[in-house]
From Swiss-Prot:
Plays a central role in 2-thiolation of mcm(5)S(2)U at tRNA wobble positions of tRNA(Lys), tRNA(Glu) and tRNA(Gln). May act by forming a heterodimer with NCS6/CTU1 that ligates sulfur from thiocarboxylated URM1 onto the uridine of tRNAs at wobble position. One of its GO terms (molecular function) is nucleotidyltransferase activity. The gene is CTU2. The keyword rRNA processing does not apply. It comes from the Eukaryota. The lineage of its organism: Eukaryota, Viridiplantae, Streptophyta, Embryophyta, Tracheophyta. Gene3D superfamilies: HUPs (3.40.50.620). The keyword Cytoplasm applies. Pathway: tRNA modification; 5-methoxycarbonylmethyl-2-thiouridine-tRNA biosynthesis. This is Cytoplasmic tRNA 2-thiolation protein 2. Keywords: Cytoplasm, tRNA processing.
Length: 464
C-alpha cells in the first residue's frame, strides 16, 4: 500500500495523470514559495492566454499566465518598445548598461535573443543587404566607495563576467570601468578626487544623485571611446515610478518628461529604455523561472528622499499592484522634449514602410535641439533657470559664477557645497568632461566682454 502511494505521488512509477493530493500539495507549496520569494503575486489554476492546465502566475493583478506565455508577454513588450521607437538600427552598435540586477539581466537576455534572431534571418537572406547590429556590455565598478572586503568585490565582479560570457554568441565586448576613471587625468589618479568630491556633499540625496550622474558620464565615456551608437538602460516601470515621485519632490517637475520616454538623445550617445513597460516584480519572476543568474552583491543602500520614495512605492504596490503603471502612464502624458525622439535625416530609412511615417511627421521647429542642460545631471533648464543664467552671463566676474549658473536648482541646492570658496574647490575636482565645456563657454564669454570693452574705449577716444 505504501509502495502504491509512493508510485502515484511523484515516485519513479508515477503516471502522467496522477491526482495524488500529496502531489497537488507539493505543487501548491512550490507556487506559494515562489510567490513569497518574488513578491505579491496572483496565482491561478490555468493560463488565461493559452488555456493550458499548468500553474499560472500573474504580477500586478493581471491575467494569470503560464511560464511560457508569461515570458512571451515580457519579450513582446521589449520587442515592441525597440521596434516601434526605432531604438536599434541594423548598422548600430549598442552598449547595454549591466548592473547585475534582474532588470539589466533580462535586458541582456532579450537583446541577445533579438540579435541571434537577426543573425538567423541574415543567414537565410538571399541578398544579405542589411547588417546585424552589435551588442556590447558595460559594468560601472563603484566598489571604491564600497565598504565590503576586496575579495568579495572581486568575486562579485567575476560573477558579472561569467554571466555575460555565458551567452553563446553576440556580445561584442565586456567593458568594466571604475567609477573613478572619469576623474582621472594624465598626472593624477581619479580615486582621491572622487572621494573628496563625494565627501564635500553633505546631503544624502544629493550624494546619491551625484553618483547617478557620474554613472551616466562613465557610460557615455565608454560608448564614445569604443564606437557605440546607443546606450541601453535596464530602467523598468518600477524604477521610473520611483523617479517620477522623487523628481517631483525635488522640484524637477519641468525636466521630468525628459526622463520617462523611450528615447533620450540629449546625450552625446543617445539613451534608450526598452523595459519601460515592465515591472520589477515581473523581471525578477522571469529570472526565477528561466534561472537567469543575477549579481546584486555590490548594490549600495539608498538613503534620503530616494529611499523614502522607494518605501512609499512599495506600500502602494502592496495595496494595489497596478499603481506603478498608473504613475508612469500619468508622467507620460507630459509633453516630451524635442530630444525624446530620433529625428536625424535618413535615420528611419531602415524601418519598415508601415512605421516610417510615424517618425517622419514631426514639426520642423522641434527637429533642432536647442535646450540648455544642467552641467551635472543634464536636466533641461526651466524658464526661471534660463533667466538666472542670462543674468549671470552679463554680470559674472568669475568663472565660478558661470559654473554655478549652469547647474539646475536641484543640483545647486542638493549637490553643491555651501560657500563660494568651497564651490571653487568642488568644481576643480569634477571630471573634465563636465568642466571642459564650461571652460570653453567661459573663455568665449571673457573674449566677448574684452572686445566690447575695447570697442567702447575706442569710441570714447574718438569722441575726445
Amino acid at each position: 500500500m505504501a509502495a502504491a502511494a509512493a508510485s502515484s505521488c511523484g515516485g519513479a512509477g508515477c503516471g502522467p495523470h496522477c491526482s495524488s493530493s500529496a502531489s497537488a500539495a507539493a505543487v501548491e507549496d512550490a507556487a506559494a514559495a515562489a510567490a513569497e520569494k518574488v513578491g505579491r503575486l496572483s496565482l491561478s489554476r490555468e493560463c488565461g492566454k493559452c488555456g493550458g492546465g499548468a500553474a499560472a502566475v500573474a504580477v500586478a493583478g493581471g491575467l494569470g499566465l503560464c511560464g511560457e506565455c508569461f515570458r512571451a508577454n515580457l519579450l513582446g513588450k521589449f520587442k515592441l518598445a525597440v521596434t516601434s521607437n526605432a531604438m536599434v538600427r541594423p548598422t548600430d552598435s549598442v552598449l547595454l548598461a549591466f548592473s547585475g540586477g534582474p532588470a539589466s539581466r533580462v535586458a541582456l537576455q532579450f537583446i541577445h535573443e533579438m540579435r541571434c534572431k537577426a543573425i538567423e534571418s541574415w543567414d537565410v537572406s538571399n541578398s544579405q543587404a542589411l547588417p546585424v547590429f552589435g551588442v556590447g556590455v558595460a559594468f560601472v565598478d563603484e566598489s571604491v566607495l564600497c565598504s565590503k572586503p576586496r575579495d568579495e568585490i572581486e568575486m562579485a565582479i567575476e560573477d558579472i563576467r561569467s554571466i555575460v560570457s555565458s551567452l553563446s554568441t553576440g556580445v561584442k565586448a565586456m567593458h568594466i570601468a571604475r567609477l573613478e576613471d572619469v576623474f582621472s587625468t594624465e598626472s593624477e589618479d581619479g580615486e582621491r578626487r572622487l572621494r573628496e568630491a563625494v565627501d564635500m556633499i553633505g546631503d544624502d540625496t544629493g550624494r546619491e544623485d551625484f553618483l547617478r550622474c557620474l554613472r551616466m558620464l562613465s557610460l557615455q565615456k565608454i560608448a564614445m571611446e569604443n564606437g557605440y551608437a546607443k546606450i541601453m538602460l535596464g530602467s523598468c516601470a518600477s524604477a521610473i515610478a520611483c523617479h517620477v515621485l522623487s523628481a517631483t519632490v525635488k522640484g524637477q517637475g519641468y525636466s521630468l518628461p525628459a526622463d520617462v520616454q523611450y528615447v533620450d538623445t540629449r546625450w552625446e550617445i543617445p539613451v534608450v529604455l526598452p523595459l519601460r513597460d515592465c515591472l520589477a516584480q515581473e523581471l525578477t519572476l522571469l529570472c526565477e523561472l528561466d534561472s537567469l543568474k543575477t549579481q546584486q552583491h555590490l548594490d549600495r543602500p539608498s538613503n534620503g528622499i530616494n529611499s523614502l520614495v522607494a518605501s512609499f512605492i512599495k506600500r502602494l504596490r502592496e495595496e494595489n499592484p497596478s499603481r506603478e503603471h498608473t504613475i508612469v502612464r500619468t508622467a507620460q502624458k507630459l509633453k516630451p522634449f524635442s530630444f525624446n525622439k530620433f529625428s536625424a535625416d535618413g535615420y528611419h530609412d531602415f524601418l519598415p514602410s508601415r512605421l516610417r511615417p510615424k517618425f517622419q511627421k514631426f514639426d520642423s521647429d522641434e527637429s533642432t535641439f536647442s535646450e540648455i542642460l544642467c552641467l551635472m545631471c543634464g536636466s533641461p533648464f526651466s524658464e526661471s533657470e534660463l533667466q538666472n543664467l542670462e543674468s549671470t552671463k552679463h554680470k559674472a566676474q568669475k568663472k565660478i559664477d558661470l559654473y554655478t549658473a549652469h547647474c539646475c536648482q536641484s543640483c545647486y541646492f542638493q549637490i553643491l557645497p555651501a560657500g563660494e570658496n568651497l564651490n571653487e574647490h568642488f568644481f576643480s575636482l569634477l571630471p573634465k568632461l563636465w568642466t571642459g565645456k564650461m571652460d570653453t563657454i567661459s573663455d568665449s564669454h571673457s573674449l566677448l566682454r574684452d572686445q566690447i570693452e575695447e570697442y567702447l574705449l575706442e569710441e570714447n577716444d574718438d569722441g575726445n
